[in-house]
Amino acid sequence: MSKTLYSFDFDDTLCHTPDHIEGKKQWEKITGLSWPYNGWWGKAETLDSDVFSVQKNEWVYQRYLDAVADEDAYLIMATGRLKKIVGMRENIDKILNQHNLSFDEVHLNWGGDTFIFKTRLFEEMIEKTGCEHFVMYDDRHEHLIKFEEWASEHHVDVTIVDVIKKEETKYKNI
């Protein structure tokens, strides 16, 4: 049983991945081709390390190292990137490996709304690990607000870390 379950989001939390505006410019510059799709986040090519140099978020990385040093910890990465997209998992794994980021489990969205995916996953992981404390790192403001509501409904202590503001909110639960 792990006392603390840590969850790290991927895009703009662990790593500074390209957004659709700068990413499309970079794609065209490196490949000489126009971006061939309408969407961005659902495409494995957005994480192609031959095109993009994805850097880790140093502030989050320091917290990741603290979590790794916690002997009673279980670490997961949870991303809204879709599992069913060919090449997505491989590209994410390549970026994680480039930055020596290792997790007990890596989870990609099985489909649908990212917030719903993550809350269901977190509930499963809290049950699986039997943790006393759940710590999550994320960057999406609209999700963080909903995660705060979600946190108050659980029997474990929850810490939500807003990696943009570099603030954490703790919820003591019984």
Language-model features: where?
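Alpha-helical substrate-recognition element adjacent to the catalytic core
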Residues: K3-F115
